[in-house]
Structures are given as C-alpha cells and as structure tokens.
C-alpha cells in the first residue's frame, strides 16, 4: 500500500520525474519565475528550497551535492553567489506559489512559482535566440 508516501508521481517514471525537477529548478533559478501546473509547482518547491539552503551553507561538499541535483554550471554559480547572498537572513520560505487559473486546452490548474524578493529583470533572460538589426534587414529583403 502507498500510505503516507511523500512525493507525487506526476504520471512519470522516477528518472523522468528527477529530470523534470532538475530542469524546472534550473529554469526557476535562471528566470526567477516560471508558470507550470500546480502539482509540478508543489513538487518543485521543497526540491528548490533544499538547493537554496545548500547554496547558503556554501562549501565544497554542498557545492558537489548541488551540482549532482542541478547539472547546470551557470545556475549552480548563481545559486552559490547571488541567491545565497539574497537569502542570507531568511530561514526558508524562498519561493511563492500563486494560482494562475486553468489551462484552456485541458483545464489543468496552473500556477506561477517564483522566488521571493526576485530580480524582475531576470524574467525572460536568455530565453532563446534574439534577432539583431542585421538579421531583421536580411529577413525583410
């Protein structure tokens, strides 16, 4: 029986679920706000809170643990520098989940998960290729 087991399966195998959490954690650290389904946001919250706590503690062993859970060098660096400094005086509660209605296609409940005291300029940062002025002129021709 599955009584009192802690995590949601999210309809995925264990390896798929771990990869999902890693990718979502990296995206949330990078953009500091993401929109996803409510169950995914609720699963991501404790995963990310533990990562931020590792970043606050610092040290080589904690950096290795974070690298094993995150697998993204740039976000790992941000975790141990920017976020560790930002949340130095906060004991937990680094994230906020805001319900955002329902998805039109399948009526899945949506939520916005964001870092508390987030940097609003980080939203959409490095989201993909950006056209330069030269490329715009080339496409117009």
Curated annotation (Swiss-Prot):
GO cellular component, as recorded: cytosolic large ribosomal subunit
Keywords, in A-Z order: Ribonucleoprotein, Ribosomal protein
A GO molecular function held by the record: structural constituent of ribosome
NCBIfam families in alphabetical order: L17
Oligomeric and partner information: Part of the 50S ribosomal subunit. Contacts protein L32.
Protein family according to the UniProt entry: Belongs to the bacterial ribosomal protein bL17 family.
Record's protein name: Large ribosomal subunit protein bL17
The species this protein was found in: Novosphingobium aromaticivorans (strain ATCC 700278 / DSM 12444 / CCUG 56034 / CIP 105152 / NBRC 16084 / F199)
Gene (UniProt): rplQ
């Amino acid at each position: 029986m599955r009584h009192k087991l802690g995590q949601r399966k999210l309809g995925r195998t264990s390896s798929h679920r771990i990869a999902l959490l890693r990718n979502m954690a990296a995206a949330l650290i990078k953009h500091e706000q993401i929109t996803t389904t409510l169950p995914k946001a609720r699963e991501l919250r404790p995963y990310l809170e533990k990562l931020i706590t590792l970043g606050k503690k610092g040290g080589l062993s904690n950096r290795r643990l974070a690298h094993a859970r995150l697998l993204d060098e740039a976000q790992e660096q941000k975790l141990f520098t920017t976020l560790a400094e930002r949340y130095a005086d906060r004991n937990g509660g680094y994230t906020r989940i805001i319900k955002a209605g329902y998805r039109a296609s399948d009526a899945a409940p949506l939520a916005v998960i964001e870092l508390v005291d987030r940097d609003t300029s980080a939203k959409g940062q490095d989201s993909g290729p950006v056209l330069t002025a030269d490329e715009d002129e080339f496409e117009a021709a």
